[in-house]
Amino acid sequence: MRAMLLLLICCLVSSFTLPAVAAQPGRVGTDLGLVELPVAQASSAPMVVFMSGDGGWAALDKGLSAQLQAHGMPVVGWSSLSYYWKKKTPDQATADLVRILTEYQSRWGRQRWLLVGFSFGAEIVPFVINRLPPAYRDSLVGAVMLSPSTASDFEIHVSDMVVHDKAGSYPTLPEVKAIKSLPLLCVQGADDDSPVKLCPHLQQPNVTTVTLPGSHHFDDDYGVLYRSIADRLPWTGEEQDH
C-alpha cells in the first residue's frame, strides 16, 4: 500500500511539472546538446537557432523560445553548457552550426533563419556569423544578442555563472564591427550592472541597441522580450539583402 501511495504522489507531482512547450531532444548529434521546438503549420517565417547562456537550456532560453515557436518560428535550442563544457574554437562552433543548419533547413523546409544568443551564447554570435559559408550567411535574416559581454572564452567556467565580469580571450567588439550590413539587435537590461556589457559600445548603423526593464534576465518577461525583437528585425516573408 505504501508503494502504491508513493507512486500516486509521483504521478500527481509530475502532472504539475510538465513543460508548457513540448521540446524534444535534437537529432543531429548528442555531442551538440540540442533541443527541438518544431511548429506544425507551414509559414514563411524563418527558423531560429538559439544559443543558450552558460547555465544551459534554462528559464530565459525556454521562455523566449516558446514565444518564438508560438509565433510560427521553429527553434533549435543549443545548450552552451553542454557544448562548451570542453573548450571549442570559433571555427569548430561554426562547423557545428553548419551541421545544424544543414539538417534543420531541410527537415523543416525553412531556408531563412534567425540567430539568437543569450549571455554566453550571445558572445558567440558574431564569431560564427563571420565564419559562415556564403550560402548559410545569405539565408541569415538577422541576429539577436541578449545581454552579451565584451569577450568570450568558448569554454564554460563555473565561476562565470555567478559573476558576469569575465575577461575572455576572444573580444566580441571587433567581430561585431566586421559585420557591415546584416541587421543586428543588441538587448540589455536597464539594471544590468555588469562592467563588461557589449551593447553600449555598438555604434554602427546596422546594429540596433535596446534597453529593457530588469537586469541580466530582463525580469523574466518573455513577452516583452519577444516583442522587442519582433518589432525591430525584418524577419517576415520579405527577402533581405546582406
List each language-model region with its residue ranges.
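Active-site nucleophile loop of the alpha/beta-hydrolase fold
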Residues: 143-154
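C-terminal catalytic histidine-bearing segment of alpha/beta-hydrolase fold enzymes
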Residues: 207-242
